[in-house]
Design a protein with these regions (language model features):
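Sec-dependent N-terminal signal peptides of Gram-positive bacterial secreted proteins and lipoproteins
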Residues: 3-30
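A short, structured surface patch at a secondary-structure boundary
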Residues: 38, 43-91, 95-100
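Flexible loop/hinge segments that line or gate small-molecule binding clefts
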Residues: 67-69, 102, 106-138
């Protein structure tokens, strides 16, 4: 017959071991949860990047764009132009991402809540590549980031090949503003960068400015051969504004672009004011507009 004391000791030992093992698993699970990033993306461009890098998000912007399946039930934090600091802080994020072009939108309310967003520079294709590489390294997604950069570089090579030994067309880029007419996009803007990569010559250049006020006399003097009209916000309204402007202002009818029917409308989801993961399709489209196969004067 077994000694009751020994049986009790064995039982106690087993319970202690199981407790230690269970506690160890619980500790590991807690540590894993603490290491998991809690990322809030406040623009659709950042959501696209996160999706390509297979990153988890706890907050996404309120947008008319179709979110990737994995983020469709994630908490909405408001529009990119006016995100809710209350909703963001409630999510206890480890990182909040926006873009440099919207840095002015994050003011005193965010500072008061000690929320410091990271502003990603997506003003050019090169900056998008750098952002992918940096985020890939930070979140251990180097392979996924390298894959996306490779796709972008392939698209750049294809556009360059298409433009070889062909005269560069003069291109005017306009950005429509709902209810406020339009601005001229320079070579420093994202679409301006697409024009450069596609082999075109932007008729308005700047060292620092992405956008500038339009001037009829200056536009007429440059006589653009191609006009690209960006309508990324409220496209239906902006397209009507552009159509009315081009109808009422006789200056446009004198440009080579209008005479030869080379005015193109750029809309989401392919085109936006900032670089995004539709860049390869966008660059290919601009390349074909600038260098059509045949039948169009350049």
């Amino acid at each position: 017959m077994k000694n009751p004391r020994k049986v009790g000791l064995w039982s106690l030992t087993v319970l202690l071991i199981l407790g230690i093992i269970g506690g160890g698993f619980a500790w590991q699970r807690q540590q894993h949860q603490q290491k998991q990033p809690r990322i809030v993306a406040t623009t659709f461009a950042v959501v696209q990047i996160a999706n390509k890098l297979n990153l988890p998000l706890v907050g996404v912007p309120t947008t008319a764009n179709t979110l990737p399946q994995r983020y469709q039930h994630v908490a909405k934090v408001g529009s990119p132009m006016n995100p809710s600091v209350e909703k963001i802080t409630a999510l206890k994020p480890t990182a909040v991402y926006s873009v440099t072009t919207l840095s002015d939108q994050f003011g005193k309310a965010f500072k008061a809540q000690h929320v410091t967003p990271h502003f990603l520079n997506l003003t050019s294709v090169a900056h998008l590549e750098q952002t992918l590489t940096q985020l890939g390294k930070q979140y251990h997604r180097q392979s996924a980031a390298a894959k996306q950069v490779k796709h972008i570089q392939a698209a750049k090579k294809l556009a360059k090949k298409r433009a070889q030994q062909r005269p560069a067309p003069r291109v005017l880029v306009l950005m429509g503003l709902p209810g406020a007419n339009y601005m001229v996009a320079t070579n420093r803007s994202y679409v301006g960068d697409l024009v450069r990569l596609a082999g075109g010559t932007n008729v308005f250049t700047s060292r620092k400015q992405e956008y500038m006020q339009p001037n009829d006399e200056a536009i007429q003097k440059t006589n653009p051969q191609v006009i690209l009209r960006l309508e990324h916000a409220m496209p239906k309204m902006v397209t009507k504004q552009f159509d009315q402007e081009f109808k009422d202002n006789q200056m446009w009818s004198k440009t080579a672009a209008v005479r030869h029917h080379r005015v193109y409308d750029l809309q989401e989801p392919i085109f936006d004011a900032t670089a995004n993961m539709r860049v390869t399709t966008a660059l290919d489209q601009v390349s074909h507009w600038l260098y059509p196969t045949k039948g169009v004067k350049v």
